[in-house]
Amino acid sequence: MSSPRLQQQFIRLWQHFQGQTTDTTLQELTGVLNCSRRHIRSLLNAMQLEGWLIWQAEAGRGKRSQLSFVYTGLALQQQRAEDLLEQDRIEQLVQLVGDKEAVRQMLLSHLGRSFRQGKHILRILYYRPLRNLLPSSALRRSEMHIARQIFSGLTNINEENGELKPDLAHHWQMLAPLHWRFYLRPAIRFHHGRELTMDDITTSLSRLIPLPLFSHIEAVNSPMPFVIDIRLSSPDKWLPWLLASVHAMILPQEWQTLPNFAQHPIGTGPYAVVRNNSSQLKIRAFDDYFGYRALIDEVNIWVLPDEPEEMPVSVQFQSDDSHHEQLESRMEEGGYFLLFDKRSPLNQRPEALRWLRQVFNPVSLLSHANTSNQRDWSPAYSLLPRWHHHHPDTPQSIPDGLTDVTLTFYQEHPEYRILSEIMRTLLAQQGVTLHLQTISYEDWYQGNAESDIWFGSLNCYLPLEFSLFAMLYELPLVQHCLNDDLDTDAQQWRSHTLPMAEWCEKLIKSGQLHPLLHHWLQLQGQRSMRGVRMNMLGWFDFKSAWFAPPER
């Protein structure tokens, strides 16, 4: 097989002479390929052996020899591009082809199932890179899903019914309201080969104590081999579910010394990270996984180069021309909303907040959206689609002196950009300027910016009465926007006495949180793929999916 370097040199030669038979000299060719006379001879011989060209040399220095092209540079470039695509070397592919639109089409044509060297490979298209996969950090919806494929927790949650399942722990019990015990499986290994120890678990869980959700944990220790005790300062009936959350995934205790751990993490889950860069995330089935080995050997998540903002944010693993089979769609349990920052001077003007909520009513936003967005969005009147807690405010005129409003959202979210432009238009019609501020997800998560309003979103999972409160309570931004004492609410929630519907209604009626839209989650792919059940994050469990062989 020819080397990539030889292929590139032939393409340069072919492009220089535009594929035409020509009389030339070795000296001229050294200038074309920028190499010595001796090296140009070996290159021409190698290209001739590959059958790409014919070199009819004439004896004598300065004599002109004939160069004839048998193969075209375009054909070889296409072959090289196919090789790079098969090897998932997307960045090199962009450099070779040059045209990013052509690269997009090539990627789209190679989505879905691939069978290479006896391995089942799934290729998925996504609209942005997945750079941070570190549990207990600021993770977006898709990063949370991928982290669950890489890491394990003491417990796990059944995505279809919200019931608890064993994971690293095979059993657990509440010895007393403030004392829980978990019994661990033996012989569990991390992706880098080391066996899991009790110190890995105590270190992983102890690092969570500064977080609001875990602040009631007083101590984590191992009184005997394969046993973990957790002692609390206040009772928590949700603790086994809390330990199944992405925050509580177990890391190797030396994780901080491992290079670029957030982007190339090491866990004990069914898949291990092979590559993670701006154009691709590749994960491979972990043969030493303590559970059932994944049926798909490798999952490649490709990111299209410089994808336009109107690209749908659904998960896609088929090409655009394959009848657009939609495996599943569902209304998300959650949605987009606005948070009014209590640190802003605007928060001291309740009449201005009421007027803004009136302008930004869901139906008005939806009526200004394009057809595609209208199909994907639905008006929200609470945080969950099943509830109707928001009632339109009494129409009023624009408050005096309201001329400028700042809205903040995080990067790489196409729908925030679309919505913000609609909101800017609506305010401009009233003579008010909307200033848009885009920041990193980490800064958004922490609320690290001066802003009047923030875009927010929520993607709950089962059981909803657990995840709805947990996902809001864990978000530092929410603490900057809500006037309520969430710590008091957390005590009720942990004791299962917080009525979630009433709590949510109170939140919305306070005016600090304003529901906007619910989103239809979509999963598009091949019907030959079995075991696919879309979860409430819009993805599916990779380890349970498999490909049915073609019918004979």
Swiss-Prot record:
Q: Where is this region: Solute-binding?
A: 163-493
A Pfam family of the record is SBP_bac_5
Q: Which UniProt keywords apply?
A: Activator, DNA-binding, Repressor, Transcription, Transcription regulation
Q: Which GO terms describe its biological process?
A: negative regulation of DNA-templated transcription; peptide transport; positive regulation of DNA-templated transcription
Superkingdom, taxonomy of origin: Bacteria
Q: Which SUPFAM superfamilies match?
A: Periplasmic binding protein-like II
Q: Which GO terms describe its molecular function?
A: DNA binding; peptide transmembrane transporter activity
Cited function: Activates the small RNA gene sgrS under glucose-phosphate stress conditions as well as yfdZ. Represses its own transcription under both stress and non-stress conditions. Might act as a sensor of the intracellular accumulation of phosphoglucose by binding these molecules in its C-terminal solute-binding domain.
* Name of the protein: HTH-type transcriptional regulator SgrR
Query: To which species is this protein native?
Result: Pectobacterium atrosepticum (strain SCRI 1043 / ATCC BAA-672) (Erwinia carotovora subsp. atroseptica)
From the broadest rank down, the organism's phylogenetic lineage runs: Bacteria, Pseudomonadati, Pseudomonadota, Gammaproteobacteria, Enterobacterales
Give the encoding gene's name: sgrR
